[in-house]
Amino acid sequence: MEFFNILQSACNDVNLDFNDKKYNQLISYKNLIQEWNKKINLTAIVEDDEIIKKHFIDCIKIFKSSPIGEAKSLIDIGTGAGFPGIPIKILKEDIEITLLDSLQKRINFLNIVIGELQLKNIQCLHGRAEDYAQEIQHRQKYDIAVSRAVANLAVLSEFCIPFVEKGGYFIAMKGPSVEEEITAATKSIEILGGKIEDIMKIDIEDTDLKHNLVIIKKLRETGKRYPRKPGIIKKNPLK
């Protein structure tokens, strides 16, 4: 009951319904993470309490951003163990989710999670964001692109903004010190057709975690040359 109450309280804070079905799905997901983490490197966070707070509640906090609540489709880029895409799907069943990751072992794990939790309207893609963002079925097709991946904001923006339709949003889940990244990325975001609309500070109760949600609105279509070829983006971020 302790974990149920913690998760329910976090959902209440962002006006999300929470029930036994969602709780059981999250606990099953936690158990699968712990089981599979013995075989492949999914996360350094493995204790029950830490998974609940540092992964699940961190993902719940993204619903503080109103675009998530209104979205019909979302792509999670560099999803890793499925964060934040899987928790978003569990908590908002009507959204269509695409999970993108470059490592096949993680995709195999995510497909197991999807099957075990009986999640619908969710797919996994194995490959590079740079490649999929040039494909017609994915380019500028999503209401929301989100990423919790570890990369600077200029790099993440070039990976993610091309997936977002005009009028949609890219939401970057960043750490506590984001000011320098924002300053360095502002021009690249503009080049890609976006503009920073909001920066939301996130505190995770009973932990030392402090995060920021950087909310970027897509104002114009992204030029055809972006994203650039694999390898170039990290070596030469847009300025």
Swiss-Prot record:
InterPro entries: rRNA_ssu_MeTfrase_G, SAM-dependent_MTases_sf. It is found in: Cytoplasm. Pfam families: GidB. GO terms for molecular function: rRNA (guanine-N7-)-methyltransferase activity. Its EC number is 2.1.1.-. S-adenosyl-L-methionine binds at residues 78, 83, 129-130, 148. It comes from the Bacteria. Keywords: Cytoplasm, Methyltransferase, rRNA processing, S-adenosyl-L-methionine, Transferase. GO terms for cellular component: cytosol. Specifically methylates the N7 position of a guanine in 16S rRNA. Belongs to the methyltransferase superfamily. RNA methyltransferase RsmG family. This is Ribosomal RNA small subunit methyltransferase G. It comes from Clostridium botulinum (strain Kyoto / Type A2).
